[in-house]
Structure formats: structure tokens, C-alpha cells
Curated annotation (Swiss-Prot):
Membrane topology: Peripheral membrane protein
Alphabetical list of PANTHER family matching this protein: TRANSLATION FACTOR GUF1 HOMOLOG, CHLOROPLASTIC, TRANSLATION FACTOR GUF1-RELATED
Enzyme type, top EC level: hydrolase
Superkingdom of origin: Bacteria
InterPro entries membership: EF-4, EFG_III/V, EFG_V-like, EFTu-like_2, G_TR_CS, LepA_C_sf, LepA_CTD, LepA_IV
GO MF annotations, alphabetized: GTP binding; GTPase activity; guanosine tetraphosphate binding; ribosome binding; translation elongation factor activity
EC assignment: 3.6.5.n1
Cellular compartment(s): Cell inner membrane
Keyword line: Cell inner membrane, Cell membrane, GTP-binding, Hydrolase, Membrane, Nucleotide-binding, Protein biosynthesis
Reaction catalysed by this enzyme: GTP + H2O = GDP + phosphate + H(+)
GO biological process, one term: positive regulation of translation
Designated name of the protein: Elongation factor 4
């Protein structure tokens, strides 16, 4: 066990985690040169295209150190984006150490800090590394100073490297061996292994990625999952080098995969503990009684409705979501029915990027044609009878008369940016009802701390932040509390009928403006009918905005030559009566663009 090192790489987006991982794998001979592709560990197409890591991946490497010993290094690659912080905490809880990669030309950014604090909370040893030293604008001294000031860890011995050119890679490997502690655990105790990740493979069923903490797991052992109490046979074991390599057993301290013929992913919950079954044939002498401390269940922050564009596709969308959930533990969904859109699902996501990626994966990998409603967050509603309910769908909020107060989720937001952009970012944060808590200067970087309603962030805050700061600002946020607020539900009515999927929740101060803007946008999108269509925005029974789409009409008096006005009147009245009858029975098709229109209403 003294020759095992488990470590992961944490960094902000684009600071070079995945490239560094590639170099480490190459240096340890995990892959031949011809198999080296850029970003070996980012296996999804969408990861390669967007240049981000979504799923944590692992590689088990053999490294011969300068002291002549061969060490087993288990590298766990982590995502850097704030939406996937859950993946990061999972990876870190399986490690004893982490390489904190900081781009020497950019310095410390928001997710560097967030992920680094996660690591320190979990008691992981952090080794700072300065990447991109080959760039002419690299400024290592400034980066070191920022690491010390912002994060508060000693960076005097930070290792300079360049993952692109391969400089400093050996020093990093030596530092991993020297500075990161060997795994603690008892090889002779009962087996306890933690599930770091699980995914679904069409051929073998569920594959579990586990970190063995105590004991050993051998091929053919009868295993039990502690949370679900389900029992299985460990059919195949192995490690990733990034290729799969079969093993007869996994020892304490190792990270590897287990295939046990599990059919549904719900059984192999991430964070669960695997142990052996006591007694019986193939049973162990003793079984673990205490589960490992797992990580907290993730709470979705952003909700949206996903509906199939054809009602007949509902089943296939459900299958697609089930399969996707196999691979993405943080996706939540439940069936819901909308009058406007038929049957679909209410899905919960960690954030907007997560939502986009889920949508894109459903469309790409499962060929789904989707209609998505505007994202919303969870509100706490205190009803007049004193009970509290949580509502994640705006159309489900009870009428104003039956509600005492609505509480919206408030988050603490940390914003980092160069000092030139402070003014613009503060203006933006104030527009979004932010309350400034703190402002700190670190060299040329400024860190602003705000309290903000999550509902204001989910629509377009991130995009706007990037545009006002020319891409330099970065952010991360964490949930703080539910707080009573003057928010109202705005319903959109077409010819007096509520369209439930178009309801939005906004602050009362913005309600009239948002109502008008949505109604105007809807007017452009809905095509003209044979009868007048009234589009209204309402709070309760109070109409706050209205637009009318005029009917298409035939020129009925074209055939009259001169003559009596009453003849023309008669024809016009007849047409009017027909239109009126039509309006009573006619229904209006709401196109997909209408649901997206709500998202694009500028503040």
C-alpha cells in the first residue's frame, strides 16, 4: 500500500487539466504515441467539442521514481465547471492528494478556489502547479502570490510546467510520490469499497468505479451494496490504464472497476459502500457493519420541462432519460402533464450548462426531438392554512388568495474579475437584485461577493457576465437559504385560456415589464389565424398587458359595384358573425419558438 498514490487534478475551465492528464499518461507509458489523441480522458464527443470535461475519468499508471521504486499512481480527472462541482467532490473523496493547476498567464479564477476549498474540506493534500509556462505572457510570481492570497496555501514550491511542451512533467510525478500521502486503510479488515462513479454499458450492464478502502475484493466474491442491500457476484474486476485491464483482485487503496451483472443503475448508487456477504459458499468470514461516509445527495437547482415534439415519442423519451440517468447521477426527472404540450417530464439539473448538455446529449445520442420550457428554480410557498410546500413548476403555484408568502432561493455568488471590469459587473449584479456583501482586491484581481436570487441567475446571468467583462470574469455560487420575497406568478393567456407551460415567476417590480415583453414577443411568433387572437399577461385576475393578432380576412365586398351601403354592411356583418363563431371553437397552435421566447426577453 505504501506504493499507491491516489490523486486528482483540480483547476478552472481551460487551465489545462485534461492536457496535463494526457502528458502524465504518456510519460508513464499508459498509451503508445499513436494512440495519444488530445484529451484522452474526455471520451464524449460533446466534451471534445466544447473542450470541457463532464464526467470524471480515471487512469491507473505505473511510475518508476528516482528512488528506484515503482509506484502505482491512480489519476482521477475532474471537471472544472461550476455545474459539475458534484463530480469534483466525488473524485476528491476517493483521493489523498490533488494537483491544483493554475494557468500562469491567468492566475487564480473562481472555480479554482471553489474546487480547492472542496479539497481542503475533505482533508486532501493540495500540490500547486503552474501550467502554461511556455506562453510569453506567463507571470509565475503573480500567480504564486494569488494562490497564497486568495486560497491561502503556500505556493513557494509551486511546480512550473507546461503540459503542452511536456516541461516539468517529471517534477510533477516526483512531487506526487513525495508529497501526497499513501492511502490509509486496513488491508486485513472487512472489505469496504466506495462507489465513485457508475455507468451503464450495453453489454455487461452497470460498471462501478470503486475505491477500495479496507480489505480486498477478489474475482468471484459475493458482494453486497449497503444502501440498497442488494447482493451480486463480482464477475469482472480491473483497472483503467486508460484501457481496461483485467485483474484477479483489487487491494486496499486501489481504484478500479467492478462488473457484477447489475441491471439497473439505481442499485449502484454513487457514494454507496460495497462489502462482502458473510458466510455461505464464497462468503467472507466477516462483513463490514459501518458504511463509509458518502457524499451528500445532490440537490437539483434548476428545473425545466422536457416534452417530446410528437406525443407518440413519450415512451422513447422516457427510455432515453432512463439511460442518460444511468450515466449522470445528478439528473432528476419525473413525469408531468401540460395542457399545452401533453405528456413530458419535469427535469432537475445542477445548473444551466448541465441543462444544455443533457438536452444536447438527448438530441445527439438518443435522437430525440425536444420541446423545452423556460428554466425555473424551486420556490417555497407558505400557504394560508400554515403549511409549506416546495414548488418547482411555476404553473403549480396556488392562486394569490391562498398564499401567505413565497420564498425564493438565495445564493451566495463569488465573482472574480480584473479590476477594469468591476463597474460593469456591479451594475449587472444590481440589475439582478444582487446585494453586495464584500469586495476584496488581490493584486489586479477583484473578488466580489453578492447575495442574489437564484431565479435571476438561471436565465442569462452567466452569458451577460461574460459579455460585460469580455470573458474575463468567472463565477461560482452556492445555495444559502430560502427567503421571503415579493415575487408573483405571471400567466400568459391565449383567447382567455391559460397556457400553463408559459407561466413565469418574476419579482413584482419587473412583472409589468416582463409581461409586456413576453406578450409582444409572442405576437411576433404566433401566426395569424382566421380570427382575432388576444394574447394577455395576467397576475391572478389582473391583466397587465395585451396584444391582439388581427384576423386574416377575405375582402367580402369586392364583388359589389357601387350601389347600396346596406348591401355591403350586410356582407360585413355576416363575415363578423362567422369570425365570432370561429373564435369560440377555434384553437391556437403554440409553436416551439414561443416557449423559448420567454428566455430571450431582455431585461
Amino acid at each position: 500500500m505504501n506504493h499507491i498514490r491516489n490523486f486528482s487534478i483540480i483547476a478552472h475551465i481551460d487551465h489545462g487539466k485534461s492536457t496535463l492528464a494526457d502528458r502524465l499518461i504518456q510519460r508513464c507509458g499508459g498509451l503508445q504515441d499513436r494512440e495519444m489523441s488530445a484529451q484522452v480522458l474526455d471520451s464524449m464527443d460533446i466534451e471534445k467539442e466544447r473542450g470541457i470535461t463532464i464526467k470524471a475519468q480515471t487512469a491507473s499508471l505505473k511510475y518508476k521514481a528516482l528512488d528506484g521504486q515503482v509506484y502505482n499512481l491512480n489519476l482521477i480527472d475532474t471537471p472544472g465547471h461550476v455545474d459539475f462541482s458534484y463530480e469534483v467532490s466525488r473524485s476528491l473523496s476517493a483521493c489523498e492528494g490533488a494537483l491544483l493547476v493554475v494557468d500562469a498567464s491567468q492566475g487564480v479564477e473562481a472555480q479554482t478556489v471553489a474546487n480547492c476549498y472542496t479539497a481542503l474540506d475533505l482533508g486532501v493534500t493540495v500540490v500547486p502547479v503552474l501550467n502554461k509556462m511556455d506562453l510569453p505572457q506567463a507571470d509565475p510570481d503573480n500567480a504564486k502570490q494569488e494562490i497564497e492570497e486568495v486560497i491561502g496555501i503556500d505556493a513557494t514550491d509551486a511546480i512550473p510546467c507546461s503540459a503542452k511542451t511536456g516541461m516539468g512533467i517529471d517534477e510533477i510525478l516526483e512531487a506526487v510520490v513525495a508529497l501526497i500521502p499513501a492511502p490509509k486503510g486496513n488491508p486485513d479488515a472487512a472489505l469496504r469499497a466506495m462507489i465513485i462513479d457508475s455507468w451503464y454499458d450495453a453489454y455487461v450492464g452497470v460498471v462501478m468505479l470503486v475505491r477500495v478502502v479496507d480489505g480486498r475484493l477478489a474475482k468471484g466474491d459475493r458482494i453486497k451494496l449497503m444502501a440498497s442491500e442488494a447482493t451480486y457476484n463480482a464477475e469482472q474486476l480491473g483497472v483503467f490504464t486508460p484501457h481496461t485491464e483485467a485483474r484477479q483482485a483489487l487491494e486496499a487503496g486501489e481504484v478500479g472497476f467492478v462488473i457484477a451483472g447489475i441491471k439497473e443503475l439505481q442499485a449502484a448508487r454513487v457514494g454507496d459502500t460495497v462489502t462482502l456477504i458473510k458466510g455461505g459458499t464464497g462468503g467472507a468470514a466477516f462483513t463490514a457493519t459501518e458504511a463509509l461516509p458518502g457524499f451528500k445527495e445532490i440537490q437539483p437547482q434548476v428545473f425545466a420541462g422536457l416534452y417530446p415534439s410528437e406525443a407518440s415519442e413519450y415512451e422513447s423519451l422516457r427510455d432515453a432519460l432512463e439511460k442518460l440517468k444511468l450515466n449522470d447521477a445528478s439528473l432528476h426527472y419525473e413525469p408531468e402533464v401540460s395542457e399545452a404540450l401533453g405528456f413530458g417530464f419535469r427535469c432537475g439539473f445542477l445548473g444551466l450548462l448541465h441543462m444544455e448538455i443533457v438536452q444536447e446529449r438527448l438530441e445527439r445520442e438518443f435522437d430525440q426531438d425536444l420541446i423545452t420550457t423556460a428554466p425555473s428554480v424551486v420556490y417555497e410557498v407558505l400557504k394560508a392554512d400554515g403549511t409549506t410546500i416546495k414548488v418547482e413548476n411555476p404553473s403549480k403555484i396556488p392562486d394569490a388568495g391562498r398564499v401567505n408568502e413565497i420564498r425564493e432561493p438565495i445564493v451566495t455568488v463569488h465573482l472574480y474579475m480584473p479590476q477594469d471590469y468591476v463597474g460593469a459587473v456591479m451594475t449587472l449584479a444590481n440589475q439582478k437584485r444582487g446585494v453586495q456583501l464584500n469586495m476584496a482586491y488581490h493584486g489586479k484581481q477583484v473578488m466580489l461577493t453578492y447575495e442574489m436570487p437564484l431565479g435571476e441567475i438561471v436565465l442569462d446571468f452567466f452569458d451577460k457576465l461574460k459579455s460585460v467583462s469580455r470573458g474575463y470574469a468567472s463565477m461560482d455560487y452556492e445555495f444559502k437559504e430560502f427567503r421571503a420575497s415579493d415575487v408573483v406568478k405571471v400567466d400568459i393567456l391565449l383567447n382567455g385560456e391559460k397556457v400553463d407551460a408559459l407561466s413565469i415567476i418574476v419579482h413584482r417590480s419587473q412583472s409589468a415589464y416582463r409581461g409586456r415583453a413576453v406578450v409582444a414577443k409572442m405576437r411576433e411568433i404566433i401566426s395569424r389565424q382566421q380570427f382575432d387572437v388576444a394574447i394577455q399577461a395576467a397576475i391572478g385576475a389582473n391583466i397587465i398587458a395585451r396584444e391582439t393578432i388581427k384576423a386574416l380576412r377575405k375582402n367580402v365586398i369586392a364583388k359589389c359595384y357601387g350601389g347600396d351601403i346596406s348591401r355591403k354592411k350586410k356582407l360585413l356583418e355576416k363575415q363578423k358573425a362567422g369570425k365570432k363563431r370561429m373564435k369560440q371553437i377555434g384553437s391556437v397552435e403554440v409553436p416551439q419558438e414561443a416557449f423559448l421566447a420567454i428566455l430571450q426577453v431582455e431585461d
